[in-house]
Amino acid sequence: RVYFVESNSSSLRNQPTSRIASNNLWSSLRLVALNQNTGVKIWSKAININKSNYPVVFFLAYAKSRLVLSYTTNRYYVDAYSSVSGSKVWSKNHSWNRDHHGGHMYHPLIVGDAVIVEPYGYKLSNGVVVHRGLPARGGCSTMSASKNTVHYINWDYDKGSMYFWDLNDNRRRLMVGSRSSCWLSLISGNGMILSPTASSGCRCRYP
């Protein structure tokens, strides 16, 4: 299946450009599921979001029969929908962890049966909080993840050292010898982690 959110606001059709600054973009929203082979619509559900101070970022992710919609205005909002029917299963919101260096626009991470939306991890099935106390990080330092591990740059970002947070045993390990960037240069897959150097062009100190 292919999932997406679309706006059916008729006023958008008269916009002179595809760069839409109008708050109408967030009106008449629908969550849609298509058959990936035929393009046939499987279901389409009207959804509502908090569009006060219209969203800064807007993400849709899928795992374990859940569609996770995450967005921010002056707070983080997390809505989980059934991928089978499109019905809402649970909804959460919480304040930003900080108001600088991208603290208002982190993307969600789905790790195992949890979705991490800073600074909490919610269980996919029911929205119960399963992770608190996410690593304190400096700079922009957003996180990426593999099946059971979260990768990030710690508070000592002037050294640029990467850390691994194993969610199975809650251990956090320092890995020295490479400097990743604050904004998603750690990519994992097939038992490996790819970390191209990111020491150039970053305004953070690099000894």
Model-derived segments and spans:
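Repeat-blade elements of multi-bladed beta-propeller folds
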Residues: R1-R30, K45, I49-D79, K92, ...
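Generic alpha-helix detector with strongest preference for long hydrophobic helices that associate
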Residues: Y62, L67, L167-N168, L174
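Short loop/turn segments that connect beta-strands within beta-propeller blades
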Residues: N35-T38, S82-S85, L124-G127, D166-D169
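Aromatic/acidic polysaccharide-binding cleft in carbohydrate-active enzymes
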Residues: A198-P207
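A short beta-strand motif characteristic of beta-propeller blades
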Residues: V40-I49, S87-R98, V128-L134, R171-V176
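Short, surface-exposed beta-strand-loop junctions and turns on beta-sheet-rich folds
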Residues: S10-S11, R75, V129, R171, ...
